[in-house]
């Protein structure tokens, strides 16, 4: 288990930052028929999110236009999604991804699982606020209308953002482990509710104790037990929560590997994780990826993506010396 070590992103504040100069250069890059995509990559992937917000403000003042809007007009395909995605503040980016996961034909349940299983209380609160401001909709109401069953109940619990923080009680851990064991045996609606209540509301520290107690009681790993007892999106969501509790960077490494190798490069997932984790733990995710899968994330992106889209992803991902 790697829950205690230091995590780190790949994008940091640029030294000697000048938002007016950056805005001018972006304005020049976006002029004309064939825009300078390399310039966009070199500037926007080498500035932290707060600096990008300042660039967008300077751009608006300078040209009277919205930088995201201009990029959406000038760029295309997945490259456009990366460049535009970099220009959202993190809570709004999560809100944007959730909105698009639920609107239109079908629901992208995997996006809902990935975001809501992995975000902190503070991130969830800010995401709900951003969702309401941007779309004039209530995130909880949209989740309720677009999902169903115990999957919906668990998402609704997570989106409250009321997980306990930093609290452990070994005696309660033993009791909760017994409840989880019974829930995996009985599988009634009531047991499913108790299962998701524990996984959604107990602190990460407490849940690590619970999972150890569960192993002692049942002789089985928590993830294996869930996979054996449940199915569908409810099962996938429960597993995602357990994996995030144990080692969040390893969870994202797993998501990236699956997106790259199991689904013929699932672009939305790769873009979302690289952008969302770039200033949080992407460097640590890279380490987990290489430890677990033998190849670097940089190597796999380079092999599966192409063109300026590939350049942008690799600039966000960055790499170790041997990757270049």
From Swiss-Prot:
Keyword Phosphoprotein in annotation: no
Gene Ontology CC: cytoplasm; nucleus; plasma membrane; vesicle membrane
Pfam families linked to this entry: Annexin
Residues making up the signal peptide according to the UniProt record: none
Protein family per UniProt: Belongs to the annexin family.
Intervals holding Annexin repeats: 17-88, 89-160, 171-243, 247-318
PROSITE patterns for the chain: ANNEXIN_1, ANNEXIN_2
Species of provenance: Homo sapiens (Human)
Any one GO molecular function term: calcium ion binding
Keywords in alphabetical order: Annexin, Repeat
Protein name: Annexin A10
């Amino acid at each position: 288990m790697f829950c205690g070590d230091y995590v780190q992103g790949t994008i940091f504040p640029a030294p000697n930052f000048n938002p007016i100069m950056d805005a001018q250069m972006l304005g020049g890059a976006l002029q004309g028929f064939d825009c300078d995509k390399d310039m966009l990559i070199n500037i926007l992937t080498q500035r932290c999110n707060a600096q990008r917000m300042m660039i967008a403000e300077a751009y608006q003042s300078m040209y009277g236009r919205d930088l995201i809007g201009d990029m959406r007009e000038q760029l295309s395909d997945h490259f456009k999604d990366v460049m535009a995605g970099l220009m959202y503040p993190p809570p709004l980016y999560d809100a944007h991804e959730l909105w698009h996961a639920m609107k239109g034909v079908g629901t992208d349940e995997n996006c809902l699982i990935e975001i809501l299983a992995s975000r902190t209380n503070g991130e969830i609160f800010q995401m709900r606020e951003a969702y309401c401001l941007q779309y004039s909709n209530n995130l909880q109401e949209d989740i309720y209308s677009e999902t169903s069953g115990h999957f919906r109940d668990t998402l609704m619990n997570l989106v409250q953002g009321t997980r306990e923080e930093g609290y452990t009680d070994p005696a309660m851990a033993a009791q909760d482990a017994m409840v989880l064991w019974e829930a995996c045996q009985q599988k009634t609606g009531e047991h499913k509710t108790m299962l998701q209540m524990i996984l959604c509301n107990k602190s990460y520290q407490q849940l690590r104790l619970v999972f150890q107690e569960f192993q002692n009681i049942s002789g089985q790993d928590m993830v294996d037990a869930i996979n054996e007892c449940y199915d569908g999106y409810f099962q996938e969501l429960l597993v995602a929560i357990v994996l995030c509790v144990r080692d969040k960077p390893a969870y994202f490494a797993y998501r990236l590997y699956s997106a790259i190798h199991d689904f013929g490069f699932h672009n939305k997932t790769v873009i979302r994780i690289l952008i969302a984790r770039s200033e949080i733990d992407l460097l640590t995710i890279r380490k987990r990826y290489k430890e677990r899968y033998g190849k670097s994330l940089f190597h796999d992106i380079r092999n599966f993506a192409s063109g300026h889209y590939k350049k942008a992803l690799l600039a966000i991902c960055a790499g170790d010396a041997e990757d270049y």
